């Protein structure tokens, strides 16, 4: 609790005061310029400078108090000069915690390695910083991955955070978890409205902050409260790198970095912070423009020898599953998963116009029930911005065939101990082929709830749901002749994992259409997909609607 009080104290607010330069500061500035420290990778990473579109350095830290120069967010040279001036400024008795040497200990550590000025400057005691370091006193660092959690939109892709392992005191009966701290970067949210939440999260309108937690309490929350499996990756960092990371987290805990749900999120800033502490490692460059938590783990493995050991921590629910499921846990490690994005190329035939077609598709994220299963929760589907275009060779027309904005499916099998609800929800755009909408593109929302029966290893799953949807299209002959269609009815499916990393999925739904000329419609789909590697798959897809049937062969590339 002492640590949390320190990090929330008013004294942690940074100001932009500009101390007057002294002779000592001038000498240090001349030496720093001669050494080119402002251009060094270590300095730029410590202040989170990244090149913008014009290849100019811009810091990703958005709290103004983090910078001592007025132009510091865009000028590494000016910020370095201002830092050295601030380090040389006189102490104010009784207010040492506000001095730059106490506020920016990671900068002090980094610059002293090159300039060796510690003996020439005053040495403030920094009471708050000293208590912080005594409380943490870490000897090692790990990255922890928490599996997907669909009940919280911010965790639909999973979550990553840091574990700081405190050195064990000479006399202590505490467990390692009790001695550890968790450090995460997350958004400071101010709304429960899902639409406003999504808008602010996607556009960087939430400030993102670094928070410290009791690691034991965090594990309890994930493993018991949210039934989320954890994977812990212990890193091979030197003691000097661990210390610099600890000092840098002190600096970051007093500022904010704007939070972007798909890009500058928990995963991105965990890696950027590790790079700041250990400039020898290169992590952020291995990320796509959309950053998902499991991408963090894959990036760690791009640095040879960085991951020292891996520990799987199953949730309470996972520990209650049959042994055959628990034995497959190593295959579910996030570093084994396919790439988050997907490119699809296909060729097929359709009865709609009696011709063949070519398709190209792109999915922003993440996984469907037919994708390669390694590194994934067996019966979970999370998709965002799944787009498919089609060129009809007979009609010589290029059309948008599908646009799934978001689709979440959680098939939770009924067991002897519990009967959890299975559900799915999606915001979609797709082509309808029936008498109420012949080859028209409709947007809609779909929601279903039901039950799932599965084998012990979950390789065979049967699910049934009560489904309801609403669709909109100017071409629809909908409710009382309007452009709105509403439908309710059963939705069912069968998923089977076959030998050789092959998956089969069959889904079917029939919908009653109230107050409409067309009283009912149906949609049946079948997929057979075989993974050649974690990032390449081949497969067949078939679809049947009242006025159309089609079959296509497709190649899938994950990256």
Residue ranges of predicted features:
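Outer-envelope beta-barrel architecture signal
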Residues: 337-343, 356-358, 376-385, 415-425, ...
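Transmembrane beta-strands of outer-membrane beta-barrel pores
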Residues: 347-353, 366-368, 386-395, 407-411, ...
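Outer-membrane beta-barrel initiation region
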Residues: 129, 147, 263, 267, ...
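Low-complexity, highly charged intrinsically disordered N-terminal segments
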Residues: 54-136
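Glycine-rich catalytic cores of cysteine/serine-nucleophile enzymes that process amide/ester linkages
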Residues: 137-227, 362, 391-403, 415-420, ...
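Active-site nucleophile-His-acid catalytic modules used for acyl/amide transfer and hydrolysis
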Residues: 215-290, 460, 471-475, 541-542
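Outer-membrane beta-barrel "beta-signal"
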Residues: 362, 526-529, 547-559
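Transmembrane beta-barrel outer-membrane domains
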Residues: 336-338, 353-357, 394-400, 416-420, ...
């Amino acid at each position: 609790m002492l640590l949390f009080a320190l990090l929330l104290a008013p004294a942690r607010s940074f100001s932009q005061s500009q101390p007057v330069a002294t002779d000592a500061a001038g000498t240090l500035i001349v030496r720093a310029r001669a050494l080119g420290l402002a251009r060094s990778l270590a300095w730029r990473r410590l202040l989170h400078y990244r090149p913008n579109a014009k290849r100019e350095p811009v810091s990703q830290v958005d709290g103004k108090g983090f910078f001592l120069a007025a132009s510091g967010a865009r000028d590494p040279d000016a910020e370095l000069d201002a830092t050295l001036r601030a380090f040389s400024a006189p102490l104010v008795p009784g207010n040492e915690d506000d001095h730059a040497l106490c506020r920016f200990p990671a900068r002090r550590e980094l610059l002293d390695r090159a300039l060796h000025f510690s003996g020439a400057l005053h040495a403030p005691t920094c009471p708050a910083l000293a208590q912080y370091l005594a409380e943490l006193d870490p000897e090692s660092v790990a990255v922890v991955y928490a599996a997907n959690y669909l009940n919280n939109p911010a965790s639909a892709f999973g979550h990553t955070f840091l574990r700081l392992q405190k050195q064990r005191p000479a006399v202590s009966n505490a467990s390692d978890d009790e001695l550890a701290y968790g450090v995460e970067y997350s958004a400071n949210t101010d709304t429960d409205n899902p639409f406003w939440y999504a808008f602010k999260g996607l556009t960087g309108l939430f400030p993102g902050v670094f928070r410290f937690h009791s690691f034991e309490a965090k594990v309890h929350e994930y493993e018991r409260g949210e039934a989320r499996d954890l994977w812990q990756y212990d890193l091979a960092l030197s003691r000097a790198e661990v210390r610099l990371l600890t000092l840098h987290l002190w600096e970051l805990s007093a500022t904010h970095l704007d939070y972007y749900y798909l890009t500058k999120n928990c995963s991105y800033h965990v890696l950027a912070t590790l790079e700041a502490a250990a400039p020898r490692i290169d992590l952020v460059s291995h990320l796509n423009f959309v950053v998902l938590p499991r991408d963090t783990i894959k990036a760690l493995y791009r640095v040879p020898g960085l991951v020292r050991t891996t520990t799987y921590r199953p949730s309470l629910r996972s520990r209650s599953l049959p042994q055959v499921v628990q034995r497959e846990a190593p295959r579910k490690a996030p570093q084994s998963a396919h790439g988050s994005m997907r490119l699809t190329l296909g060729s097929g035939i359709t009865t709609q116009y009696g011709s063949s077609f070519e398709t190209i598709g792109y999915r922003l994220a993440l996984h469907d029930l037919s994708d390669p299963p390694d590194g994934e929760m067996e019966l979970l589907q999370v998709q965002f911005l799944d787009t498919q275009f089609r060129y009809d060779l007979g009609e010589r027309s290029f059309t948008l065939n599908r646009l799934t904005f978001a689709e979440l499916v959680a098939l939770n099998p009924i067991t002897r101990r519990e009967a959890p609800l299975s559900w799915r929800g999606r915001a979609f755009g797709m082509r309808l082929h029936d008498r109420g909408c012949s080859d028209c593109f409709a947007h809609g929302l779909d929601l279903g709830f039901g039950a799932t029966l599965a084998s012990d290893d979950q390789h065979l799953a049967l699910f049934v749901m009560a489904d309801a949807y609403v669709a909109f299209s100017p071409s629809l002959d909908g409710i009382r002749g309007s452009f709105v269609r509403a439908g309710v009815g059963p939705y069912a499916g069968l998923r089977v994992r076959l030998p050789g990393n092959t998956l089969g999925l069959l889904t079917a739904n029939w919908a009653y259409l109230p107050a409409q000329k067309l009283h009912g419609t149906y949609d049946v789909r079948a997929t057979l997909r075989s993974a050649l590697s974690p990032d390449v798959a081949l497969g067949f897809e078939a679809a049947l609607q009242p006025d159309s049937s089609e079959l296509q062969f497709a190649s899938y590339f994950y990256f």
